[in-house]
């Protein structure tokens, strides 16, 4: 006999786990389906692990300048990349364990496996059919690997990486070419430059951090350049040949090399495989209204998969809003 729930949430990131906990606290019988580890991109492959790297970089730079504060050190200041990665893993594990504890404490049934959404009323996990009155899709997004000549081959060799692979790289790169000057690219540029890597950012737009206010963009670009990071704007990558990146700037093609090449050109909603539901889409993004409802009754979509604002705190608020709408609690609606 199938288990029955009021709400099944597919995806255990910030939107999914917050929605699940909130629904349970409101008294609903709720299940959360996650194929990897709860916490999503933010806790496992994004916000949190990158901040641990930034903290290590900050400590390293502070110690190097310790004499400015009247503190002397003996010998040359160095770093152990494997220990930096290990510390990152420890912080991530601590936080994801905390999320798992909160889910259990609040009585959420967690299913580890791929959630196959058959309809608004059925989700199959590991061959088990779960029945529900409502489904919340919180499947997140994945980094885009652009169809630039040579990128696929270099990606398969581990030379081209996305942010997810770069967080777990074992051999520290002495040089790195970063394609894309958005938040992710700039964050990694800051980290690797701090530890002494030669860093080059290639950005198609007229400046880095294109979604930020101009005052911030200009000021931070100056800071990065002062610290030795090369920033190439209005530049387009034409091809990749193993460690070599050829780009076009002002009508002239130039080739540079890097131990690693980071592709940070954006993300794409994880909506593949949901076509049979008849969802209204905007490219890969699932269209939703202010209550996070899709065009299919009983199906909601929150977080990166709806493509509105791909930020963890936005996903969390969307999750709460969707749950309140399902359970008819209050009159909350999203106002971006």
From Swiss-Prot:
It comes from Acholeplasma laidlawii. Its cofactor is FAD. The active site is a redox-active disulfide bond. One of its GO terms (molecular function) is flavin adenine dinucleotide binding. Belongs to the class-I pyridine nucleotide-disulfide oxidoreductase family. Keywords: Cytoplasm, Disulfide bond, FAD, Flavoprotein, NAD, Oxidoreductase, Redox-active center. Binds 1 FAD per subunit. It is found in: Cytoplasm. This is Dihydrolipoyl dehydrogenase. Lipoamide dehydrogenase is a component of the alpha-ketoacid dehydrogenase complexes. The lineage of its organism: Bacteria, Bacillati, Mycoplasmatota, Mollicutes, Acholeplasmatales. GO terms for biological process: 2-oxoglutarate metabolic process. FAD binds at residues 34-42, 51, 115, 304, 312. NAD(+) binds at residues 180-184, 203, 237, 264-267. It catalyses: N(6)-[(R)-dihydrolipoyl]-L-lysyl-[protein] + NAD(+) = N(6)-[(R)-lipoyl]-L-lysyl-[protein] + NADH + H(+). One of its GO terms (cellular component) is cytoplasm. It comes from the Bacteria. InterPro entries: Class-I_Pyr_Nuc-Dis_Oxidored, FAD/NAD-bd_sf, FAD/NAD-binding_dom, Pyr_OxRdtase_I_AS.
């Amino acid at each position: 006999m199938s288990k029955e729930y009021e709400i099944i949430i597919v995806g255990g990131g910030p939107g999914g786990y917050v929605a699940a906990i909130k629904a349970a606290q409101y008294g609903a019988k709720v299940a959360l389906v996650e194929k990897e580890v709860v916490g999503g991109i933010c806790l496992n492959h994004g916000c949190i692990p990158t901040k641990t790297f930034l903290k290590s970089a900050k400590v390293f730079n502070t110690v190097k300048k310790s004499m400015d504060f009247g503190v002397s050190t003996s010998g040359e200041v160095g770093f152990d990349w494997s220990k930096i990665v290990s510390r990152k893993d420890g912080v991530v594990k601590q936080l994801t364990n905390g999320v798992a504890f909160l889910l259990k404490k609040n009585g959420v049934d967690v299913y580890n496996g791929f959630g196959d959404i058959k309809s608004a009323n059925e989700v199959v996990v590991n061959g088990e059919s779960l029945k529900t009155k409502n489904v919340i899709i919180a499947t997140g997004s994945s980094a885009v690997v652009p169809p630039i000549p040579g990128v696929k081959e270099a990606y398969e060799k581990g030379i081209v990486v996305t942010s997810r692979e770069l967080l777990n790289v074992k051999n520290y790169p002495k040089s790195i070419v970063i394609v894309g000057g958005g938040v992710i690219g700039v964050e990694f540029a800051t980290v690797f430059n701090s530890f002494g890597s030669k860093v080059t950012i290639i950005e198609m737009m007229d400046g880095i951090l294109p979604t930020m206010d101009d005052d911030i963009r200009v000021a931070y670009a100056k800071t990065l350049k002062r610290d030795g990071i090369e920033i190439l704007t209005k530049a387009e990558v034409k091809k990749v040949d193993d460690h070599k990146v050829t780009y076009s700037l002002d009508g002239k093609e130039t080739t540079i090399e890097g131990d690693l090449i980071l592709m940070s050109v954006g993300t794409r909603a994880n909506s593949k495989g949901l076509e049979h539901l008849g969802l209204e889409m905007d490219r890969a993004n699932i269209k939703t209204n202010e209550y996070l409802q899709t065009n299919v009754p009983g199906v909601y979509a929150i977080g990166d998969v709806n493509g509105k604002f791909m930020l963890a705190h936005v996903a969390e608020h969307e999750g709460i809003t969707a749950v309140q709408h399902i359970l008819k609690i209050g009159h909350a609606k999203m106002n971006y």
